[in-house]
């Protein structure tokens, strides 16, 4: 099971144009993220998330074990100064292009370096996921950011996608999901979904392996639109 997650504004951004993203969503989503980490074998983020947020990717707000922390940086642009490469609160796997790993090189700070083939159509995403499965990581949580989650989604490697939407309008900034365009709406995916309230935010939990009409699986606990006014 591979699950992607993004927290975004009403207008579809995960950060401002300057990269300020802490925090688009509220405290309830932070707790949810920690719960998802605790339930996962591995948590994956891209280089942009590490560079912008310097996350720990550990479990702190709920009981549970720390997952394997995985940083996907195919272009190898990150220095070893970030917390995932300097602390020992949990194991870290640094995945980059095999072409950028020097002979005999195995470590980046406290992290283990693994090179993968990034020349395939998925840009190395498929190889990275295969690597995790070979290490026994079957429950994978792709926590961000937009580029990495979009790459997993474009490669059809996500089983579920969670989108937390906060009641904020950013106007312009770093987008959430960006995929190859479709000319017709009939070609666009409409996955089956469930809706959950998280404090002031709303979480859409989408099953990407099952299509549904817009009316399918509406949560009965969410009031219908005729009660808005």
Model-assigned labels for residue ranges:
Residues 1-229:
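Enzymes that bind and transform nitrogen-containing heteroaromatic metabolites
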